[in-house]
Amino acid sequence: KADKASTEALSKRGESHLAPRTFNMTIGGLEKALLKEIPAEDAEKWDRTGLLVGERSLPVTRVAVALDATPGAVAAAAEAGASVLLTHHPAFLEAPDAFAPEASALESPGAVVWAAIRNQVALMDFHTALDVSPAAARVLPGMLGLKFTLRFAEPLEGSRRKGYGQICEVPDNDGEPEALARLAARCMAVF
């Protein structure tokens, strides 16, 4: 959150870091930009990466982000005015058997596709390609104040810079071991 003093100072200069940025980008342009940073070639062969549902030529209005594509996440994206729902996990791995809204509490992949089309929200994901991304591998350790070591629990075959499960070092605490309670508190603060 911006504090009031900095917002007022920017307003006096005629600037505002809170002003909405405008840009022209299509859904296909967004996908292309993300695939440049998170290459589809890094994804597991069984995974789906990139645009799953949507029209590449349509403009991006806003982008909503969620872990999973669910009918509720699609509805929230649409309500927020987003034309894209960017998720970690794909809406489906195998093609759905049917595309229809679900009346039950169980959410089927077909119901997600139905909701996306009905609400005109494109679905895009980068699952395992993001899991092994060098840039993404540094985000959580950075948030938790851990040192990234460029070592992985499961390195990606043929790569020294990519893999699953980054191994991190806990920073030195004036010669004292890191207390589990302090590390847990950092996790709670971040998440």
Regions found by a protein language model. Give the residues of each.
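Hydrophobic structural segments
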Residues: K4, L10-R13, H17-F191
